[in-house]
Design a protein with these regions (language model features):
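Conserved C-terminal portion of the radical SAM core fold
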Residues: 91, 110-116, 136-289
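Eukaryotic beta-rich interaction modules
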Residues: 39-45, 76-78
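Core AdoMet radical
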Residues: 2-41, 53-69, 82-101, 108-140, ...
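Amphipathic alpha-helical interaction motifs in eukaryotic regulatory proteins
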Residues: 76-77, 127, 143
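Distinct, well-ordered alpha-helical segments
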Residues: 73-76, 100-107, 171-173
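Surface-exposed alpha-helical interface segments used for non-catalytic interactions
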Residues: 70, 74-77, 136, 177
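Catalytic domains of carbohydrate-active enzymes, especially glycoside hydrolases
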Residues: 48-52
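Short, acidic, metal-binding catalytic loop of nucleotide-sugar glycosyltransferases
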Residues: 78-84, 148
Length: 290
C-alpha cells in the first residue's frame, strides 16, 4: 500500500478531501500533503552520487515509481558507460504498472536485479487499494518481465511484496495462490522467487487487528484453505502467514468498532472523490465494517 510519504499525488488527493470534508478534518486536523524534495531533478544530488561510482556494489532505486524517473535511467546508463554495471546489484520496489522496454533493456546490464513487486491484491482488490491501477495491465507487465528474465544473462530475485491490511486480508489466500502459480510456472536457473509481505499498522483503522469476528472467520477460512506447498515455496512467507493467522484468531481490540467507523469515513470520502464504490471492487466489503 502506497502512503503519502512516497506519493505526492496521494498526499494532494487526501489533502483536497480534508479541506472540504468535516469528518475527514476531525480525523486529520493537520495537512496530509507532505513537503516534496524533487531529488530526481536536483543536479547537485546526481553530481554528488557520481563521486561514489567506483565504490558502488548495491544501488537502491526509488521514486515514486522508479521505472518512471528519468534520472534513474540516466544514472544507470552512466554506470554502464563507465564499465562498472556488471559488478553492481540494483534493487527497487515497483508497482508493476509501467514496464517500458527501455527499463527492461537497461537492467540487463547489471550483475543482479532485485525487484520487490508491490502488488496488494488480485483483481478488483488490487485496483481499489492501488487505484487507478488496472489488473490486466499488471498481469501483462509481469508476463513481459518474465519473458525478459527467461532470456537474460544476469540474475534476478523477484519478491511479491503485498501490504496486508483489513481491506485485503480476505483476499490474501487468492494472492498467495496467484503468486505461487506464476512462480511455479516460471522457474529459471537465473531466477529466485520469494514473498515478503508487510502488515499495515497505519492508519491504525486499516490494521487487521480491528476486524469483526465475522470478517475474521471469513479470512481465516480462506487462508487455511491455502495449500502448504504454496506457502513453503516462498522462504519468507511462512512466519508472516502464521502471524496473520494468530492475529485473526485473537480477541479483537476494545476500540475496534470506533476504528471501523473511521475506516468507513476514510473509504467513503475517497470513493466520493474518485467517483467509485468499494462494492464494485471488493466483494466482501460489507463484512469489513460489521
Amino acid at each position: 500500500m502506497c502512503t503519502v510519504i512516497y506519493s505526492s499525488e496521494l498526499g494532494q488527493e487526501l489533502e483536497s478531501i480534508r479541506q472540504t470534508n468535516k469528518d475527514f478534518q476531525k480525523m486529520y486536523p493537520d495537512s496530509l500533503e507532505y513537503p516534496v524534495y524533487d531529488w530526481s531533478n536536483d543536479q547537485t544530488f546526481w553530481s554528488d552520487l557520481e563521486k561514489y561510482i567506483p565504490y558502488i556494489e548495491i544501488i537502491n532505486l526509488t521514486g515514486g515509481e522508479p521505472t518512471l524517473v528519468q534520472g534513474n535511467y540516466d544514472f544507470l546508463q552512466k554506470l554502464i558507460d563507465v564499465g562498472v554495471s556488471k559488478n553492481i546489484v540494483i534493487t527497487f520496489n515497483t508497482n508493476v504498472t509501467n514496464f517500458q522496454q527501455r527499463f527492461l533493456d537497461i537492467i540487463g546490464h547489471f550483475a543482479k536485479v532485485r525487484l520487490a513487486l508491490s502488488i496488494d491484491g488480485t483483481g478488483g482488490v488490487q485496483e481499489y487499494i492501488r487505484f487507478p491501477s488496472k489488473w490486466k495491465a499488471i498481469q501483462n507487465n509481469i508476463q513481459k518481465l518474465l519473458e525478459h528474465v527467461k532470456d537474460a544473462n544476469n540474475k534476478f530475485e523477484l519478491s511479491f511484496a503485498p501490504a496486508i491490511s483489513i481491506l485485503n486480508v480476505a483476499n490474501f489466500n487468492d494472492y498467495i495462490n496467484w503468486s505461487y502459480n506464476i512462480a511455479d510456472q516460471h522457474q529459471y536457473d537465473n531466477l529466485v522467487w520469494d514473498m515478503d509481505p508487510s502488515r499495515v499498522h497505519g492508519p491504525e483503522f486499516q490494521d487487521i487487528w480491528h476486524a469483526t469476528k465475522e470478517y475474521r472467520q471469513i479470512s481465516l477460512t480462506k487462508l487455511k484453505s491455502v495449500q502448504t506447498k504454496s506457502i513453503e515455496f516462498f522462504p519468507s512467507l511462512q512466519n508472516f502467514y502464521n502471524e496473520i493467522i494468530t492475529c485473526l484468531e485473537s480477541n479483537y481490540h476494545d476500540h475496534a468498532e470506533a476504528n471501523r467507523k473511521s475506516l468507513k469515513i476514510w473509504n467513503d470520502s475517497i470513493d466520493k472523490k474518485r467517483r467509485i464504490n468499494i462494492k464494485d471492487y471488493i466483494p466482501y466489503s460489507e463484512a469489513i465494517y460489521g
